């Protein structure tokens, strides 16, 4: 999953950091669907693999953009994607505080940016599929956008069910999420099967039994 997260981050940034080619709204719709499926079958590994690149993407697309309509809508779609995945994570892990945060600070400004994937024919169609690119649209600018990263990290790290299934404590999760992540970091994580390391605290924290509706135990914690 670390490798997939790195590829998704690079794809999301194509056209922003790399102007030779650009991702499309369809790419974001499909990435959102893929992450949704992963979080259903591997919620713990999915959080560990995808949260660091999400936080990196949030920071990289927080600056204002006014110069180019395509860049404006690409930037806004990146911000929508970050919020959409955090909403999925919060639903899976029943983290209501993050859902409330997104409802107040995220949805009112970015709900219109949700991309859609093209409908595919039930039968084989040899004609090329028209994939729309970023261009002019609803917005003329992408104003500066500040995510409350410390709050998001604190809320996820304090989730007792996540601590239990990841076999670490809140301090360990905070250290994992606070890392300076890059796509290259994700590839190294994949090569080394990296995961959070238990960090002792001065005040021991008992890992209480997870809520009855928490994600089921996963057969493997390998997040490569």
Regions found by a protein language model. Give the residues of each.
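Alpha-solenoid helical-repeat scaffold
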Residues: 1-224
């Amino acid at each position: 999953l670390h490798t997939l997260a790195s590829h998704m981050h690079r794809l999301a940034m194509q056209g922003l950091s790399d102007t030779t080619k650009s991702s499309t709204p369809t790419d974001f719709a499909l990435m959102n669907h893929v992450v949704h499926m992963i979080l259903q079958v591997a919620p713990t590994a999915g959080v560990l693999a995808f949260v660091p690149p999400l936080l990196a993407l949030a920071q990289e697309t927080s600056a204002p953009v006014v110069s180019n309509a395509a860049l404006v809508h690409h930037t806004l779609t990146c911000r929508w994607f970050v919020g959409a995945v955090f909403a999925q994570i919060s639903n899976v892990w029943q983290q209501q505080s993050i859902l409330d945060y997104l409802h107040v600070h995220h949805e009112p400004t970015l709900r219109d940016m949700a991309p859609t994937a093209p409908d595919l024919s039930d039968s084989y169609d040899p004609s090329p599929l028209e994939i729309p690119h970023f261009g002019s649209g609803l917005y003329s600018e992408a104003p500066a956008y500040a995510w409350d990263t410390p709050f998001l990290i604190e809320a996820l790290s304090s989730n007792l069910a996540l601590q239990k299934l990841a076999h670490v404590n809140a301090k360990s999760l905070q250290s994992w999420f606070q890392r300076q992540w890059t796509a290259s970091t994700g590839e190294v994580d994949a090569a080394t099967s990296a995961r959070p390391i238990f960090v002792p605290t001065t005040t021991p924290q008992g890992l209480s039994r997870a809520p009855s509706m928490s994600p089921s135990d996963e057969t493997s914690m390998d997040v490569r």
